Amino acid sequence: YGLVGSEMCIRDRATYKNASLPAEERAGLLLKELTLEEKVSLMMDSSKPVERLGIKPYNWWNEALHGVARAGLATVFPQPIGMAASFSPETVYEVFTAVSDEARAKNAYYTSQESHERYQGLTMWTPTVNIYRDPRWGRGIETYGEDPYLTSRMGVMVVKGLQGTNDGKYDKLHACAKHFAVHSGPEWNRHEFNAENIKPRDLYETYLPPFEALVKEGKVKEVMCAYNRFEGDPCCGSDRLLMQILRDEWGFDGIVLSDCGAIADFYRDYGHKTHPDAESASAAAVLSGTDLECGSSYEALVEAVKQGKIDEKAVDVAVKRLLTARFALGEMDE
């Protein structure tokens, strides 16, 4: 038994199971063990388990707009538009530090019960840093107002409060800047609206500054791409937004995820209809840098690879980012 135990310990130290290795290295080691079908199953909000490798189910969709949402009793703070009226970034930091404490505690409880449902995880799809330009937009209360500077200051503090100081073994939580970009209502046509003829000055002085601040100052771990189109391309398939601006200009190296159903908008009749089917839409989204889908269109990625619409190496890039985040949060460990 001693020899067998020693061999197992040595083997584990050289694999993704070794918790002393950096998260990115562990992700790379685990990636090598996965089949294409298993990789794809990890790329949607309700991530499937891979039992043969000890990967648990995980739900990426969790909410904390002004308190831990939909996960039982929690402290309810004012809506973001109300917190913005305080003009106190320090207060917002304290609020979301408390929110992250509660979220971590709730996750620990649910995990102890072997429950991995939506709203029980560690990846919070908050904050909303879109600009509240038109008071007729019903979801304007989720924003920090009409001013890009104030929105930036508040948003950075939301992220820092949620993600914590990162001085422990694992990250506390991962926050998400949404909805990228040029997304300020109305709701009724967001699945087909095309934001075009946006003047460069308006883009860079109004719509983009909060996201840039959250990436560069806040070190936000996730960015959610919006439903609408930008200059003809769905935001979740926009090379301009997701590759040129977000990753190349700003240096973002985290996860890009879609709003819920946004990939299906690429091809369904009441959406953008920029792509003929789920295979083409999913391939385009991943190639543009959308790592994670809230929805189920990414199931078509297996067939898309077989059809030559996308190389499996592009899938690997996305999956490695997802696994790195899960290791960094400690979610993959006991």
PLM-predicted stretches and their roles:
Residues 1-3:
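A short, hydrophobic C-terminal helix/tail in secreted or cell-surface proteins
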